[in-house]
Swiss-Prot record:
TSP type-3 repeats lie at residues 268-300, 301-336, 337-359, 360-395, 396-418, 419-456, 457-492, 493-528. InterPro entries: ConA-like_dom_sf, EGF-like_Ca-bd_dom, EGF-like_dom, EGF_Ca-bd_CS, Growth_fac_rcpt_cys_sf, NOTCH1_EGF-like, Thrombospondin_3-like_rpt, Thrombospondin_3_rpt. Plays a role in the structural integrity of cartilage via its interaction with other extracellular matrix proteins such as the collagens and fibronectin. Can mediate the interaction of chondrocytes with the cartilage extracellular matrix through interaction with cell surface integrin receptors. Could play a role in the pathogenesis of osteoarthritis. Potent suppressor of apoptosis in both primary chondrocytes and transformed cells. Suppresses apoptosis by blocking the activation of caspase-3 and by inducing the IAP family of survival proteins (BIRC3, BIRC2, BIRC5 and XIAP). GO terms for cellular component: collagen-containing extracellular matrix; extracellular exosome; extracellular matrix; extracellular region; extracellular space; protein-containing complex. This is Cartilage oligomeric matrix protein.
Length: 757
């Protein structure tokens, strides 16, 4: 290296000398230019020297690495073929990764483990990305460092210390902890005063006004004006509930239409079936969340207990077979076995070996009438039973017509054919149609022939109805001063001196159902709303263009469903009423068709009843014979007094919006001419006081009143039975049905009379 450097130096000097002005001896002073050149040359030599040193270090490192990877010991020389010994490695600077200890062993130098936060063999270590272990709180950014990691601050709505660490094990075992801040407790919310603040994870929500306040988050919550019960006492009911005064003087809270709950708490009830859309913080059954929010199902039936009500569950029994294809939609039967090939699978068929699509079971013994040798369960075989469908173990038959008195519609007059053209349970052979008080009971069978009393109450069973009996309980105390008018108590004991005798305290009719829940507290024969037993009436029995209605009763008789696109028909309960309040929820659970549905009251026979019916769209009936009938959309109240009874005349008269002579009178029509909406729930309220002819019907869509007939006066029918009506419309639901005996004349009756005068 030295000779080469000297040559470079001499050549440089020679070149400089030749280029100068004049010749200068070699030992003379060099000019400034030569000095600069020498300095630059020297700097270049220094750079070369440093590069050489770096190369030496790299070559040494490579050599050590190769030697470290090979097995130590004797190696055969490539050149001589003789065994040779490879020299042992020794610890030296740079042999191991910075911070890693070098250990000298008998077999040579070894490096310790990589530092925390790194991975490798000690000689070479690379950084570990601890962020891959997700040590930070969700939504918090993780920053990888060399070595280690750190988490950014907890997100808004949470609090917690800073978090950082080194190593994968630490990152996995130690997660960042961020605790939710309860803004409702710390005051870090912006809800208006006197409203409900609801804490959520990482945030909060502002709810409705607190009890006792009204308004919202936009307008603020102001203290609600004091509300009072009918007796003048302060009301503790929910703002969407009414305070009701009971017979015994106690107060109850009842949620308003469109709301459900226990009255102290009420929540939205979209489908108007009596159950709130969301669970309320109260223990009563009516505080539970509705398992079908948009389809009324007042019984909340849920066969497979999956939390989805049968009314809105596409596979109600959970057997994997959709309802529309399942031959037992409410009984699990994935095999769909059906021995008798009727509509019902063996799992739910009450006559497995005999077709019986109606599944009728009169005595409710689990065996269908079609295969039951004792249909009524009175221990007399059907063939020998003179009332095979009505229990009558005595088999009494007064008129000897082969029909037992228990089921004979003319028990005192022979009529083996039992013809009853007007469906009033009085056979044609003895039906006089003479009814001077118009209550639906012919004079010969009426226990008060001149006083309307469709219910025919007779508390003392003396043959004289309570309506015309001065001593209903026959205890010797006239009704006018009897403190228990319906229960014998000649001593008139009244310990608390409240005017109600001890024997009828809290249960006026002594039917063992307390007055508070008794729908007819002055009629021991009627206690709860129940349509499980009902009469079917087909209003167009001729022809086969359409089928008869198919009625399904649910919720212990408080819900009815009609499934078929059918001829006009009725499902009528057997209980007759004088004054009555009747309410229910109406819902068409399909987008198919646009025809009539409604309810009836004052039913006396198939030619005499009131009907409230609702059509969706305007339509002319497809059969123009016997006359052209045009239905308009909207709610209609009609009085039916047909001279022909069920048949084509009555059918078309019912379809037609208007009067039809000798058939139907239109008493009121909703002037809005608005039809019902598909899959929308409506709540109706009917008041009927036949003693004065008072009728009023109201309809609600949610909490909003959408139709009101106001006072309508008509005395065509002075009492009768209740039921539901359909005409060519399928999938109708009448849910949360309630009736209540009520003879009290509403205040607006007097107001109406004054206006008329």
């Amino acid at each position: 290296m030295v000779p080469d450097t000297a040559c470079v130096l001499l050549l440089t000097l020679a070149a400089l000398g030749a280029s100068g002005q004049g010749q200068s001896p070699l030992g003379s002073d060099l000019g400034p230019q030569m000095l600069r050149e020498l300095q630059e040359t020297n700097a270049a030599l220094q750079d070369v020297r440093e590069l050489l040193r770096q190369q030496v270090r790299e070559i040494t490192f490579l050599k050590n690495t190769v030697m470290e990877c090979d097995a130590c010991g004797m190696q055969q020389s490539v050149r001589t073929g003789l065994p040779s010994v490879r020299p042992l490695l020794h610890c030296a600077p740079g042999f191991c990764f910075p911070g890693v200890a070098c250990i000298q062993t008998e077999s040579g130098a070894r490096c310790g483990p990589c530092p925390a936060g790194f991975t490798g063999n000690g000689s070479h270590c690379t950084d570990v990305n601890e962020c891959n272990a997700h040590p930070c709180f969700p939504r918090v950014r993780c920053i990888n460092t060399s070595p280690g990691f750190r988490c950014e601050a907890c997100p808004p709505g949470y609090s917690g210390p800073t978090h950082q660490g080194v190593g994968l094990a630490f990152a996995k075992a130690n997660k960042q902890v961020c605790t939710d801040i309860n803004e409702c407790e710390t005051g870090q919310h912006n809800c208006v005063p006197n409203s409900v603040c609801i804490n959520t994870r990482g945030s909060f929500q502002c709810g409705p006004c607190q009890p006792g306040f009204v308004g919202d988050q936009a307008s603020g919550c102001q203290r609600r004006a004091q509300r009072f019960c009918p007796d003048g006492s302060p009301s503790e009911c929910h703002e969407h509930a009414d305070c009701v005064l009971e017979r015994d003087g106690s107060r109850s809270c009842v949620c308003a239409v469109g709301w459900a709950g226990n009255g102290i708490l009420c929540g939205r009830d979209t489908d108007l079936d009596g159950f709130p859309d969301e669970k309320l913080r109260c223990p009563e059954r009516q505080c539970r969340k509705d398992n079908c929010v948009t389809v009324p199902n007042s019984g909340q039936e849920d066969v497979d207990r999956d939390g989805i009500g049968d009314a809105c569950d596409p596979d109600a029994d959970g057997d994997g077979v959709p309802n529309e294809k399942d031959n037992c939609p409410l009984v699990r039967n994935p095999d769909q076995r059906n021995t008798d090939e009727d509509k019902w699978g063996d799992a739910c068929d009450n006559c497995r070996s005999q077709k019986n699509d109606d599944q009728k079971d009169t005595d409710q013994d689990g065996r269908g009438d079609a295969c039951d040798d004792d249909i009524d369960g009175d221990r007399i075989r059907n063939q020998a039973d003179n009332c095979p469908r009505v229990p009558n173990s005595d088999q009494k038959d007064s008129d000897g017509d082969g029909i037992g008195d228990a089921c004979d519609n003319c028990p005192q007059k022979s009529n083996p054919d039992q013809a009853d053209v007007d469906h009033d349970f009085v056979g044609d052979a003895c039906d006089s149609d003479q009814d001077q008080d118009g209550d639906g009971h012919q004079d010969s069978r009426d226990n008060c022939p001149t006083v309307p009393n469709s219910a025919q109450e007779d508390s003392d069973h003396d043959g004289q109805g309570d309506a015309c009996d001065d001593d209903d309980d026959n205890d010797g105390v006239p009704d006018s001063r009897d403190n228990c008018r319906l229960v014998p108590n000649p001593g008139q004991e009244d310990a608390d001196r409240d005017g109600v005798g001890d024997v009828c305290q809290d249960d006026f009719d002594a039917d063992k159902v307390v007055d508070k829940i008794d729908v007819c507290p002055e009629n021991a024969e009627v206690t709860l709303t129940d349509f499980r037993a009902f009469q079917t009436v087909v209003l167009d029995p001729e022809g086969d263009a359409q089928i008869d209605p198919n009625w399904v009763v649910l919720n212990q008789g408080r819900e009815i469903v009609q499934t078929m696109n059918s001829d006009p028909g009725l499902a009528v309960g057997y209980t007759a009423f004088n004054g009555v309040d009747f309410e229910g929820t109406f819902h068409v659970n399909t987008v198919t068709d646009d025809d009539y549905a409604g309810f009836i009251f004052g039913y006396q026979d198939s030619s005499s009843f009131y009907v409230v019916m609702w059509k969706q769209m305007e339509q002319t009936y497809w059969q123009a014979n016997p006359f052209r009938a045009v239905a308009e959309p909207g709610i209609q109240l009609k009085a039916v007094k047909s001279s022909t009874g069920p048949g084509e005349q009555l059918r078309n008269a019912l379809w037609h919006t208007g009067d039809t002579e000798s058939q139907v009178r239109l008493l009121w029509k909703d002037p809005r001419n608005v039809g019902w909406k598909d899959k929308k729930s409506y709540r109706w309220f009917l008041q009927h006081r036949p003693q004065v002819g008072y009728i009023r019907v109201r309809f609600y869509e949610g909490p909003e009143l959408v139709a009101d007939s106001n006072v309508v006066l008509d005395t065509t029918m002075r009492g009768g039975r209740l039921g539901v009506f359909c005409f060519s419309q399928e999938n109708i639901i009448w849910a949360n049905l309630r009736y209540r005996c009520n003879d009290t004349i509403p205040e607006d009756y007097e107001t109406h009379q004054l206006r008329q005068a």
